[in-house]
Regions:
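Extracytoplasmic/periplasmic ligand-binding sensor regions of membrane-associated signaling proteins
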Residues: 90, 104, 108-164
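The feature marks either
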Residues: 98, 132, 188-191
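Extracytoplasmic/periplasmic sensory segments of membrane signal-transduction proteins
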Residues: 60-118
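Conserved beta-strands of PAS-like sensory domains
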Residues: 143-181, 188-192, 197, 227-233
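Surface-exposed loop/edge segments in extracytoplasmic proteins
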Residues: 107-108, 194-200
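Juxtamembrane extracytoplasmic/periplasmic/luminal helical "stalk" adjacent to the first N-terminal
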Residues: 8-78
Length: 236
C-alpha cells in the first residue's frame, strides 16, 4: 500500500513539474512572439514615417525642378519686367517663400522685394555654385534666423548667373519631422553637412543617440537629402 502511495505521489510530483515547465515554456514563447511582433511593428512604423517624409519632400522639390525652365529665361530681363512673372511663379509653387534672380553673383531681383543689388555670397556663403545645389540654411532677409531650404539652378558655365528658390521648410517641419511618441523620439532632415531637427532648427551635427536608441536613415532617390528617424532600439 505504501509503495502504491509513493508511486502516486511521485506521479503527481512529476506531473506538476511537467505542467510547470510547459506553462513556463508557453509564457516564454508568448512573450517572445509578442516582443518580436512589437519590434517588427515599431520598425514598420519607423520605415513608414521615413518613407512618408521622403515622398513629401520629393513632391515639394519636383515642381521646382520642372519650373526652372520657366525661370531661367527671366535672367535675360531687367527686374522691372521679370518681377511679376517671379511673383506669379512663387504663388504657383505654394511651398516657396521667395525666388531670386542672380546675375554675375549679384542678387538683382526678388519675388518679394523687387529690385535688389546684393552680392549673393553675403546672404548665402555657398552661393553662387557651378552646379545644381540643394542646401539647408537660415534666412538672412525676411524671417531672419528661420530655417530655409534653398534650391539653386545655375544658368552660366561659371555659375555666377542663376535662379535661387527658397522653400519655407519651417512650415513643412511639422508635417515632415514631428515625432510620433513613443516609437519615434526624434526626426531630422539632412542636406549636405547640415541637419534640420524638429524643434531645434538647423544644426551642424546630429545629436548623439542614447544607449537605448537606434537611428534609421532613408535617402531620396531623386534629390540629395536624407531623413533620419530615431527611436527605441530593438533590444528595448
Amino acid at each position: 500500500m505504501q509503495t502504491a502511495q509513493r508511486i502516486i505521489n511521485h506521479y503527481r510530483r512529476n506531473r506538476f513539474i511537467v505542467c510547470t515547465i510547459c506553462a513556463l515554456v508557453t509564457l516564454i514563447l508568448t512573450l517572445s512572439i509578442r516582443f518580436i511582433s512589437e519590434r517588427n511593428l515599431n520598425h514598420h512604423r519607423t520605415v513608414a514615417f521615413a518613407n512618408h517624409a521622403v515622398d513629401a519632400l520629393d513632391n515639394v522639390l519636383h515642381p521646382l525642378q520642372v519650373g526652372r525652365n520657366v525661370l531661367l529665361p527671366l535672367l535675360e530681363l531687367p527686374c522691372a519686367t521679370a518681377h511679376l512673372p517671379l511673383r506669379k511663379q512663387a504663388a504657383r509653387l505654394q511651398t516657396v517663400r521667395s525666388i531670386g534672380l542672380v546675375k554675375e553673383g549679384i542678387l538683382y531681383c526678388s519675388s518679394i522685394f523687387g529690385a535688389r543689388n546684393t552680392p549673393i555670397r553675403q546672404l548665402q556663403p555657398d552661393l553662387p555654385a557651378v552646379g545644381d545645389l540643394l542646401l539647408l540654411s537660415t534666412d538672412q532677409s525676411l524671417l531672419k534666423g528661420s530655417p530655409i531650404l534653398i534650391q539653386w539652378y545655375p544658368a552660366s558655365a561659371d555659375g555666377q548667373d542663376g535662379v535661387m528658390e527658397i522653400v519655407n521648410i519651417d512650415l513643412l517641419t511639422t508635417m515632415l519631422l514631428e515625432p510620433q511618441q513613443p516609437q519615434i523620439t526624434s526626426a531630422s532632415l539632412t542636406v549636405g553637412k547640415r541637419h534640420l531637427l524638429y524643434g531645434r532648427g538647423v544644426v551642424d551635427t546630429l545629436p548623439e543617440l542614447k544607449k537605448d536608441e537606434e537611428r534609421y536613415q532613408l535617402s531620396s532617390r531623386h534629390f540629395p537629402f536624407t531623413i533620419s528617424v530615431s527611436g527605441p532600439s530593438a533590444g528595448v
